[in-house]
């Protein structure tokens, strides 16, 4: 099967201005050694899209189309967050602005801890799941966006642990590893995280086209 058209375009726009995400993606894309330059949209002066979808998939597509329309290039976008079943799936798509201000990690973590207090008990841990959805469009009106998803299951701690990562990493406990995701190295995290898993699906899609 022939290579996808976007690989011949020379540039793939990464539709994100989130420094934490960009750092992780730069590492993940470097491992793929794609024959294109992956450029964060900020380098092209592309502002954030208005995320008015009701799901991770919708918002990922919105962001990818937005970046592709302005740049005229293929684009890939990530929409991700943490879902806590006892909160009805919240923070969900509102993870980055859960406490009000977009990207205020400390405030978001504090609100999550506060909201979980009524559900805490000594017998049972509170489950949570990181979700990542990648959407790739070859052009702004691409009728068939490619979707790649990753899910990372863990528990929500009662207090922050670790200094690495970003977002809710300090509250995300991996019982089998006896550490939070904020205590993992970038390399360790990328191997098993929701974003790493979504990128693995992306990698597999490229292999099927070789």
From Swiss-Prot:
Enzyme Commission number: 3.6.1.66
Catalytic activity: XTP + H2O = XMP + diphosphate + H(+); dITP + H2O = dIMP + diphosphate + H(+); ITP + H2O = IMP + diphosphate + H(+)
Cofactor, how bound (note): Binds 1 Mg(2+) ion per subunit.
Residues at which Mg(2+) binds: 79
Cofactor: Mg(2+)
Active-site residues, record numbering mapped to chain: 79
Gene Ontology MF terms in the entry: dITP diphosphatase activity; ITP diphosphatase activity; metal ion binding; nucleotide binding; ribonucleoside triphosphate phosphatase activity; XTP diphosphatase activity
SUPFAM superfamilies: ITPase-like
Transmembrane parts of this sequence: none
Pfam families in UniProt: Ham1p_like
Gene3D superfamilies: 3.90.950.10
CDD domains named among the record's database cross-references: HAM1
Gene Ontology biological-process entries: nucleotide metabolic process; purine nucleoside triphosphate catabolic process
Top-level class of the enzyme under EC nomenclature: hydrolase
Signal peptide extent: none
Domain of life: Bacteria
Keywords assigned: Hydrolase, Magnesium, Metal-binding, Nucleotide metabolism, Nucleotide-binding
Residues where substrate binds: 16-21, 80, 166-169, 189, 194-195
GO cellular component: cytosol
Protein role: Pyrophosphatase that catalyzes the hydrolysis of nucleoside triphosphates to their monophosphate derivatives, with a high preference for the non-canonical purine nucleotides XTP (xanthosine triphosphate), dITP (deoxyinosine triphosphate) and ITP. Seems to function as a house-cleaning enzyme that removes non-canonical purine nucleotides from the nucleotide pool, thus preventing their incorporation into DNA/RNA and avoiding chromosomal lesions.
UniProt similarity note: Belongs to the HAM1 NTPase family.
NCBIfam families linked to this entry: RdgB/HAM1 family non-canonical purine NTP pyrophosphatase
Summary of subunit composition and partner proteins: Homodimer.
Stated name of the protein: dITP/XTP pyrophosphatase
Organism of derivation: Acinetobacter baylyi (strain ATCC 33305 / BD413 / ADP1)
């Amino acid at each position: 099967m022939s290579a996808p058209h976007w690989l011949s375009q020379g540039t793939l726009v990464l539709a994100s201005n989130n420094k934490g995400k960009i750092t992780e993606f730069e590492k993940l894309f470097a491992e793929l050694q794609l024959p294109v330059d992956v450029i964060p949209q900020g380098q092209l002066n592309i502002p954030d899209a208005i995320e008015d979808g009701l799901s991770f998939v919708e918002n990922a597509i919105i962001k990818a189309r937005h970046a592709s329309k302005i740049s005229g290039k293929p684009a890939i976008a990530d929409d991700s967050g943490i879902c806590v079943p006892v909160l009805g799936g919240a923070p969900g798509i509102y993870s980055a602005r859960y406490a009000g201000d977009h990207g205020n990690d400390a405030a978001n973590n504090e609100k999550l801890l506060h909201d979980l207090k009524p559900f805490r008990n000594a017998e049972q841990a509170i489950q949570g799941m990181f979700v990542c959805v990648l959407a790739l469009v070859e052009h702004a009106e691409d009728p068939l966006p490619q979707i790649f998803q990753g899910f990372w299951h863990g528990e929500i701690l009662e207090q922050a642990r670790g200094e690495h990562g970003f977002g809710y990493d300090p509250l995300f406990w991996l019982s089998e590893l006896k550490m939070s995701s904020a205590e993992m190295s970038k390399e360790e995290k990328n191997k098993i995280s929701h974003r790493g898993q979504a990128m693995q699906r992306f990698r597999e899609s490229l292999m099927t086209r070789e």
